[in-house]
């Protein structure tokens, strides 16, 4: 049976990550002080219209009905912040909500709220959670300096300041749902890649907008009639964009649309009772209800009345639905972009299932089976058309059930509906148990409905096929059976969703057919174990370390000690999906080795339900919302295990023809890196659209504040016939300009020097009074770090004997520092070995590391000696290990290899 949907009421208390209750206080104004005028009081608009002489209508009577909803939503928001991801971009002054899902990397800022978070706030979306579509940097604007020019086919061209717009024209205020034409695009990208990025199902938001009617402004300026050629009204923004060789963002609407009082088109200057935020077009933008967001120009500067539609690059090369056979090359070659019949203006009908949410598991027990489960979601249509019906099917469309609808808005006086509505349907849990999927479709008053199957187009726009949630029966918790729900995709570039799984299965070998059956069937195929994401997250320690790579789950616990990079290389990713990072740093051989540790597949579900329907003990109905993570203040230590931290290149110096010193500034100038002596970090960069990660040991001291130094050898192209392309990361670093941002992740490594002769190796303590240190090439950096730590502590009496091998004398890294230390400290002895010497008087060894060299320059093996080595594997095995064994070293226990 169906039950009506009510606006949910929420307290201001949310469970924090640690289980404690946190209270969020309302944030009256989250705008940056960099734009001080944002907080100025807006001049009052006239109570009666003064622009056109028309009688004011009753259309404003209900404009204050949403104040309580706005205040409630703002009261549940954490403050917006200056996100570190924006630090090196032109948007580094814009404050943003940290929970927003970024869809295009760091810049430009394109984002949507997590779907559960969006639905939690109900009808009115708080401005910081409203989806954002930016084509470039956010323009910096001041209220008092801004003006909007009206020109073209008008009798009285004018330029209106913001104060004039607000005081000389009546203002309208009403709720409008904005939708990006790319909403749900990722579903299209899973079928075939479009030219657009991965919008999820939250590219939709609703706010209360206040602004000046466009028709009033145009009438004030004396807009010409159609008979005199006024066919189109063009809008142009302020941002500088690259499209078409350089342009502003611009578009247009038909004259009839612009002048239609039923259309409620406004020049918006307030959102939810406050001035627009920078991301949403401060100080003024177009609001065109019922249209796609791409027509609502932000940072509005010009309104031009013309005969022809806008000739702007973005008007023609964006927001089009081309036939499915037309790809990007065909569209360009055959000029499809310029065919007017393919332009998008009004939104189409669409609906989405939001409850059950993605990754939800509904336990099947005596409690849940005795009461119905409520399915929920949203629906919208365009052009002011009312959504009249929403239907659910659980058997592929053979039978449909009509849902209850909740329309929180009132239509305007012309009967137009500008906002989304919410639907709900109560179903029996046993019916869900027998269903393979749940699908939804909506209808509007023009009897438009959603197609069953996805219709691909090159821009991936207006996707409105049935929204399907897959169900699987699984073992949920404590042996309990549950129903796992999976949405088609997750937004952005994150992995997850049943479409990704089915795509992987379609391209997999015949050996994976049993897995395919297990995913497509509502009952588990026990030949392949399935685990939820919440179960994987529990295995994040040395006692049990699981990782996810390409949807497969691997138990790497028994490989921790054998991993060449040390246990930390695994533990830093334990309990997570590390697909991208694994692919970035591992060879095909390593990928094959991983298969030995495969234990099952990911069903991308978590046990704790995100839905209020599954609260077993009557918890608050806010329990379906994922806990809001508190934004912690910047720590004194920069490194956060498992996280990538941004650093900025602030200095670089050539130490030789192929050696560079790079100085990277930490996120805060009062931070230390937080890297234990002997460990290293991954340096992360995107090169040719792929993640590249390389391990480096900083040469700066562990207590250096505000930055870290890396000494890097640059492997140029064609400098080594074995590696004709050179080093990918080192050449990238060498090419970077000052100010570039790189990400660092760590700590990593299995060796840690804790001071005064003490080490932890794979967590086991070791001690030595004397250290035999053997390094080759860039392998000197971790040994250099240990030397530095010992010399820095006056009470550390550990003796050090260094043998350092290189190809030539010019290749010796950090020689000046090593020689200086050796002169000043008797406990440090340094000996160099070079393959070839080009000058006379070379006082060190020539050739390779030999037994005779080691016997002369490092101590004989004994209980108080440890050997440290770092270099090429061939050097370690042939020159170090074999010769140390001849010198009475127990290489299993006394040789530490970085």
Curated annotation (Swiss-Prot):
Residues 528-603 form the Cytochrome b5 heme-binding domain. The keyword Heme applies. Residues 1-15 have a biased composition (Basic and acidic residues). One of its GO terms (molecular function) is nitrate reductase (NADPH) activity. Heme binds at residues 563, 586. Its cofactor is FAD; heme; Mo-molybdopterin. GO terms for biological process: nitrate assimilation; nitric oxide biosynthetic process; sulfur compound metabolic process. Binds 1 FAD per subunit. Binds 1 heme group per subunit. It comes from the Eukaryota. Keywords: Disulfide bond, FAD, Flavoprotein, Heme, Iron, Metal-binding, Molybdenum, NAD, NADP, Nitrate assimilation, Oxidoreductase. Residues 1-65 are annotated as: Disordered. Its EC number is 1.7.1.2. Residues 642-754 form the FAD-binding FR-type domain. Belongs to the nitrate reductase family. Homodimer. This is Nitrate reductase [NAD(P)H]. The lineage of its organism: Eukaryota, Viridiplantae, Streptophyta, Embryophyta, Tracheophyta.
């Amino acid at each position: 049976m169906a039950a009506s949907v009510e606006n949910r009421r929420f307290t201001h208390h949310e469970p924090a990550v640690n289980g404690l209750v946190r209270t969020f206080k309302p944030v009256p104004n989250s705008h940056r002080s960099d734009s001080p005028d944002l907080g100025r009081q807006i001049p009052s608009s006239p109570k009666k219209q003064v622009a056109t002489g028309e009688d004011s209508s009753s259309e404003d009577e209900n404009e204050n009905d949403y104040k309580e909803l706005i205040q409630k939503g703002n009261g549940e928001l954490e403050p917006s912040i200056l996100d570190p991801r924006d630090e090196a971009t032109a948007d580094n002054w814009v404050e943003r909500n940290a929970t927003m899902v970024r869809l295009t990397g760091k810049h430009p800022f394109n984002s949507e709220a997590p779907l559960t978070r969006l639905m939690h706030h109900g009808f009115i979306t708080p401005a910081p959670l409203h989806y954002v579509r930016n084509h470039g940097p956010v323009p910096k604007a001041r209220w008092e300096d801004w003006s909007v020019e009206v020109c073209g086919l008008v009798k009285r061209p004018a330029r209106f300041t913001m104060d004039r717009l607000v005081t000389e024209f009546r203002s309208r205020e009403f709720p409008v749902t904005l939708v990006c034409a790319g909403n749900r695009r990722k579903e299209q990208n899973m079928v075939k890649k479009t030219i657009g990025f991965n919008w999820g199902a939250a590219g939709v938001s609703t706010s209360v907008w206040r602004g000046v009617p466009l028709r009033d402004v145009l009438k004030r300026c004396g807009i010409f009639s159609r008979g005199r050629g006024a066919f189109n009204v063009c809008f142009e923004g302020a941002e500088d964009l690259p499209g078409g060789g350089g342009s502003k963002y611009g578009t247009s609407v038909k004259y009839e649309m612009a002048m239609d009082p039923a259309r409620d088109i406004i020049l918006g200057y307030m959102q939810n009772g406050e001035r627009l935020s920078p991301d949403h077009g401060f100080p003024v933008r177009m609001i065109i209800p019922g249209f796609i967001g791409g027509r609502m120009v932000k940072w509005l500067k010009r309104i031009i009345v013309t005969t022809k539609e806008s000739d702007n690059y973005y008007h023609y090369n964006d927001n089009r639905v081309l036939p499915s056979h037309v790809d990007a090359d065909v569209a360009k070659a055959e000029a499809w972009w310029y065919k007017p019949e393919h332009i998008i203006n009004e939104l189409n009908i669409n609906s989405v299932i939001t409850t059950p949410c993605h990754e939800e598991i509904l336990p099947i027990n005596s409690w849940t089976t005795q009461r119905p489960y409520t399915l929920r979601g949203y629906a919208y249509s365009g052009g002011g058309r009312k959504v009249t019906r929403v239907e659910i099917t659980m058997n592929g469309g053979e039978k449909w059930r009509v849902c209850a609808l909740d329309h929180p808005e009132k239509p305007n006086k012309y009967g137009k509906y500008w906002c989304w509505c919410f639907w709900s349907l109560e179903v029996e849990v046993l019916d869900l148990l027998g269903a393979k999927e749940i699908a939804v479709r909506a209808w509007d008053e023009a009897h438009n409905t959603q197609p069953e199957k996805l219709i691909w187009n090159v821009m991936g726009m207006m996707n409105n096929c049935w929204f399907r949630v897959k169900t699987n029966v699984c073992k949920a918790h404590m042996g309990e059976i549950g129903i796992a729900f999976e949405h088609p995709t997750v937004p952005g570039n994150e992995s997850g969703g049943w479409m990704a799984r089915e795509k992987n299965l379609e391209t997999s070998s015949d050996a994976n057919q049993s897995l395919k059956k297990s995913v497509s069937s509502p009952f588990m195929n026990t030949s392949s174990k399935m685990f939820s994401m919440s179960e994987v997250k529990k295995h994040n320690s040395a006692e049990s370390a699981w990782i996810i790579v390409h949807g497969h789950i691997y138990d790497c616990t028994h490989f921790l000690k054998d991993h060449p990079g040390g246990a930390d290389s695994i533990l830093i990713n334990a309990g997570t999906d590390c697909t991208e990072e694994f692919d970035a740093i591992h060879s095909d051989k390593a990928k094959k080795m991983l298969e030995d540790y495969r234990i099952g597949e990911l069903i991308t579900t978590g046990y704790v339900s995100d839905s209020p329907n599954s609260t077993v003990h009557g918890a608050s109905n806010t329990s379906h919302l994922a806990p809001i993570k508190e934004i912690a203040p910047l720590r004194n230590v920069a490194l956060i295990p498992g996280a990538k931290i941004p650093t900025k290149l602030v200095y670089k110096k050539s130490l030789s023809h192929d050696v560079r010193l790079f100085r990277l500034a930490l996120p805060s100038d009062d931070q230390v890196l937080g890297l234990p002596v002997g460990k290293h970090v991954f340096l992360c960069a995107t090169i040719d659209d792929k993640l590249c990660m390389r391990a480096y040991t900083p040469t700066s001291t562990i207590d250096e504040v505000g930055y870290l130094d890396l000494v890097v050898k640059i492997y140029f192209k064609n400098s080594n016939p074995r590696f004709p392309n050179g080093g990918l990361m080192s050449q990238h670093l060498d090419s970077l300009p000052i100010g570039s941002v790189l990400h660092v992740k760590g700590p990593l490594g299995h060796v840690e020097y804790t001071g005064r002769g003490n080490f932890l190796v794979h967590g086991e303590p070791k001690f030595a009074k004397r250290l035999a240190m053997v390094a080759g090439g860039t392998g000197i950096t971790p040994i250099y770090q240990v030397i530095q730590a010992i010399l820095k502590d006056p009470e550390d009496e550990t003796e050090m004997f260094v043998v350092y091998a290189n190809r030539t004398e010019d290749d010796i890294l950090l020689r000046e520092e090593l020689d200086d230390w050796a002169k000043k400290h008797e406990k440090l002895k340094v000996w160099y070995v070079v393959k070839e010497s080009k000058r006379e008087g070379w006082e060190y060894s020539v050739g390779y590391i030999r037994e005779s060299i080691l016997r002369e320059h490092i101590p004989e093996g004994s209980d108080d000696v440890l050997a440290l080595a770092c270099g090429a594997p061939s050097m370690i095995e042939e020159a170090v290990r074999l010769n140390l064994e001849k010198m009475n070293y127990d290489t299993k226990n006394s040789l530490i290899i970085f």
